[in-house]
């Protein structure tokens, strides 16, 4: 009986570990989504403060980190204006880290980026922006079949 209990605890711990990948290229949101899928990965979902902290800590350790950097998140309101969902799961965004006055929710700004820009005081905050007209770093995460049982 103890073996089963240990296995369940181990699976629970594994289910919460996220593995990120940031390639050395920038793309628009749609190309970023296609790129992650081509690697059998998802665009990153940030569904809790813990997820956000893990992503920030990962980014800070890469060569992509600077005083003015932008990263795509796997969220958009393309399906329904003003209703942001995670592309990998279709779940509504319940945790957010929007910058002040964001999302601005114009019809042209449907995709979500995470910004670290000390010049405009946006420190790891989120912004809605045009999906096609802007290039940012791609953030993919490993797909986890166990994650659906969280």
Curated annotation (Swiss-Prot):
Subcellular location: Secreted
SMART domains cross-referenced by the UniProt entry: CLECT (SM00034)
Assembly mode: Interacts with putative receptor-type tyrosine-protein phosphatase mosPTP-1; the interaction probably mediates the recruitment of Japanese encephalitis virus particles in complex with C-type lectin mosGCTL-7 to the cell surface. (Microbial infection) Interacts with envelope protein E (glycosylated) of Japanese encephalitis virus in a calcium-dependent manner.
Main location: secreted
Remarks, miscellaneous: Antibodies against the protein added to infectious blood meal block the interaction between mosGCTL-7 and envelope protein E of Japanese encephalitis virus and reduce Japanese encephalitis virus infection after feeding.
Physiological role: Carbohydrate-binding protein.
GO molecular function: carbohydrate binding
C-type lectin domain residues: 18-140
Entry protein name: C-type lectin mosGCTL-7
Any single GO CC term annotated in Swiss-Prot or TrEMBL for this entry: extracellular region
Disulfide bond sites: 111-131
Phenotype when the gene is knocked out: (Microbial infection) RNAi-mediated knockdown results in reduced Japanese encephalitis virus infection levels.
Domain of life of the native organism: Eukaryota
Secretion signal span: 1-17
Positions annotated with a glycan in the UniProt record: 67
Coiled coil: none
The entry's keywords: Disulfide bond, Glycoprotein, Host-virus interaction, Lectin, Secreted, Signal
Pfam families: Lectin_C
InterPro entries per UniProt: C-type_lectin-like, C-type_lectin-like/link_sf, C-type_lectin/snaclec_domain, CTDL_fold
Stated induction or repression of this protein's expression: (Microbial infection) Up-regulated in salivary gland following infection with Japanese encephalitis virus (at protein level). Up-regulated in hemolymph following infection with Japanese encephalitis virus.
């Amino acid at each position: 009986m103890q073996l089963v209990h240990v296995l369940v605890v181990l699976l629970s711990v594994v289910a919460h570990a996220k593995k990120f990948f940031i390639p050395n290229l920038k793309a628009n949101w749609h190309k970023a989504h296609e790129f992650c899928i081509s690697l059998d990965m998802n665009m990153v979902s940030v569904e809790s403060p813990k997820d956000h902290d893990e992503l920030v800590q990962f980014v800070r350790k890469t060569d992509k980190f600077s005083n003015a950097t932008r990263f795509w998140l796997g969220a958009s309101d393309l399906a329904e204006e003003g209703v942001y969902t995670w592309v990998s799961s279709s779940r509504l965004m319940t945790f957010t880290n929007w910058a002040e006055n964001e999302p601005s929710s114009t019809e042209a700004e449907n995709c979500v980026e995470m910004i670290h820009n000390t010049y405009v005081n946006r420190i790891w905050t989120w912004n809605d922006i045009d999906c096609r007209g802007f290039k940012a770093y791609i953030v993919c995460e490993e797909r986890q079949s166990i994650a659906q049982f969280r």
